[in-house]
Regions:
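Acidic (Asp/Glu) carboxylate-rich active-site/surface patches
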Residues: 1-186
Length: 186
C-alpha cells in the first residue's frame, strides 16, 4: 500500500504547493478510505469566544475527523496522530472536550491511539491525511472566494491585514467573522 504513495509524491504537505496537494489528493481520495471535518471560520470564532484556544480546537477537529471516519468504516487498527503538543497538554484538551458525549465515549474505549512528533515526515498515512485535509481547505477557500468575489489569503501577515480592511469596507464588519479567524494578532 505504501510504495505507490511515494510514487505519486506523498510527503509532508508543508513541503508541497497547493497545485501539487490538489493533484495528489485527487488520486488519494479515490484509493484510500478517509473522512474529514471542516470547521468554518465562523465555527472557529465561536469556539474562541467560548474560551477554547487554537490547540484545543485542533484537538476537536482531529477527534471529529476520527469519529467521522469511524462512522463510515469499521476499523480496529491503531490511530496515529501527528503530535502537535505535549501529551499532558493533549490530555488536558481531551478533558476540556469531555462534555461532548461522542468524544468522551470514544476516548474511554480507544486505547489504540498514538501521537507521533513530526508524524507527517515519518508515517505515510499521516502525510496522506494531511494532504487530503489541505485539499479540502483549498476547495473550501476557493468556494468562499467565488461566493464573495474576493480572493482571501491564508495566514496572518501585513497583506492579510490590508485585505481585512478592504473586505470590511466592501462587505461590512458584520460579515468578517464569517470569512476569517478573528483572533489572530497581526
Amino acid at each position: 500500500m505504501i510504495n505507490w504513495t511515494y510514487e505519486i509524491g506523498v510527503r509532508d504537505s508543508k513541503l508541497l504547493n497547493d497545485d501539487k496537494i490538489d493533484k495528489i489528493a485527487s488520486i488519494l481520495i479515490k484509493k484510500i478510505p478517509f473522512a474529514v471535518y471542516v470547521l468554518t471560520q465562523s465555527g472557529y470564532n465561536k469556539m474562541i469566544n467560548k474560551g477554547f484556544n487554537a490547540n484545543v480546537i485542533k484537538f476537536f477537529i482531529h477527534t471529529q475527523s476520527i469519529l467521522n471516519f469511524q462512522k463510515r468504516y469499521e476499523f480496529d487498527k491503531k490511530i496515529i496522530i501527528d503530535k502537535y503538543s505535549t501529551l499532558n497538554a493533549i490530555n488536558n484538551y481531551q478533558r476540556k472536550m469531555s462534555f461532548i458525549k461522542d468524544f468522551s465515549e470514544f476516548y474511554k474505549k480507544n486505547e489504540l491511539m498514538y501521537f507521533l512528533e513530526h508524524g507527517e515526515q515519518k508515517i505515510q498515512a499521516i502525510a496522506c491525511a494531511s494532504i487530503i485535509a489541505r485539499h479540502y481547505l483549498n476547495n473550501y477557500m476557493k468556494n468562499q472566494n467565488d461566493k464573495w468575489g474576493f480572493n482571501f489569503l491564508l495566514g496572518a501577515n501585513q497583506k492579510v491585514k490590508s485585505q481585512i480592511n478592504e473586505f470590511t469596507k466592501k462587505f461590512g464588519k458584520q460579515n468578517l467573522e464569517k470569512v476569517i479567524k478573528t483572533n489572530f494578532k497581526i
